[in-house]
Amino acid sequence: MFEYLTGLITMVSPDFIVVDVNGVGYRVAVANPYAYQEDDQQAVQVFIYQAVKEDAITLFGFATQAEKRLFTQLIGVSGIGPKSALAILATPDHQGLIDAIQNGDDKYLSKFPGIGKKTASRIIIELKDKVVAVQDEVQLDFTAPGPLGPSAALQDALAALESLGYTTKQVERVQKQLEGLQGELSTNDYLSQGLKLLSR
């Protein structure tokens, strides 16, 4: 079983990243791929959960041990699979997620894809006491995977550009220019600027 991978990010896609470890590329599913950046110089550490099925082995990656622990707690709830757990962890507000579980806020949990009221209630019942251990064991710093990645607003804008039909390479081409923009920009601001850059 893998505990973590330390290597270079050689590919970033809407659903996964590729971590090159000594010339071997590992495809790793992560909640927010665009929090990572392709970099052939600076290695990053990605914590790993390995899911083994009869027909496939899937690696799920996390920026911190705390995020990985929360993931394993979520998939331990009946009705929550790895993909649903990743979708939940895609929210940038992990503290808000934990608060919702502790406070019994099923409306907050029901907003995630594939999570109905019954499943939200199960999450609360089964994890209300367990998520405290995540806070006690590891400082909550879910959003810093090695080198600093783009903001949540920029991540959303990059994902939106791909959903509009632009290729990963096209989006990556304008990403650094968008990161250099000054001021606090919204997703729409980044999207508008990105479209202008791509139209050149």
Curated annotation (Swiss-Prot):
Region annotation Flexible linker: where it falls in the sequence: 143-151
Positions of region (Domain II): 64-142
Name of the molecule in the record: Holliday junction branch migration complex subunit RuvA
Function comment: The RuvA-RuvB-RuvC complex processes Holliday junction (HJ) DNA during genetic recombination and DNA repair, while the RuvA-RuvB complex plays an important role in the rescue of blocked DNA replication forks via replication fork reversal (RFR). RuvA specifically binds to HJ cruciform DNA, conferring on it an open structure. The RuvB hexamer acts as an ATP-dependent pump, pulling dsDNA into and through the RuvAB complex. HJ branch migration allows RuvC to scan DNA until it finds its consensus sequence, where it cleaves and resolves the cruciform DNA.
Origin superkingdom: Bacteria
Record flagged with keyword Cell inner membrane: no
Gene Ontology terms for molecular function: ATP binding; four-way junction DNA binding; four-way junction helicase activity
Keywords in alphabetical order: Cytoplasm, DNA damage, DNA recombination, DNA repair, DNA-binding
Pfam families linked: HHH_5, RuvA_C, RuvA_N
Subunit and partners: Homotetramer. Forms an RuvA(8)-RuvB(12)-Holliday junction (HJ) complex. HJ DNA is sandwiched between 2 RuvA tetramers; dsDNA enters through RuvA and exits via RuvB. An RuvB hexamer assembles on each DNA strand where it exits the tetramer. Each RuvB hexamer is contacted by two RuvA subunits (via domain III) on 2 adjacent RuvB subunits; this complex drives branch migration. In the full resolvosome a probable DNA-RuvA(4)-RuvB(12)-RuvC(2) complex forms which resolves the HJ.
GO biological-process terms attached to the record: DNA recombination; DNA repair
Region annotated Domain I, chain positions: 1-63
Family: Belongs to the RuvA family.
Domain notes: Has three domains with a flexible linker between the domains II and III and assumes an 'L' shape. Domain III is highly mobile and contacts RuvB.
Region (Domain III): 151-200
Cell compartments where the protein resides: Cytoplasm
Classification via InterPro entries: DNA_helicase_Holl-junc_RuvA_I, Hlx-hairpin-Hlx_DNA-bd_motif, NA-bd_OB-fold, RuvA, RuvA_2-like, RuvA_C, RuvA_C_sf
GO CC annotation: cytoplasm; Holliday junction helicase complex; Holliday junction resolvase complex
Cell division in keyword set: no
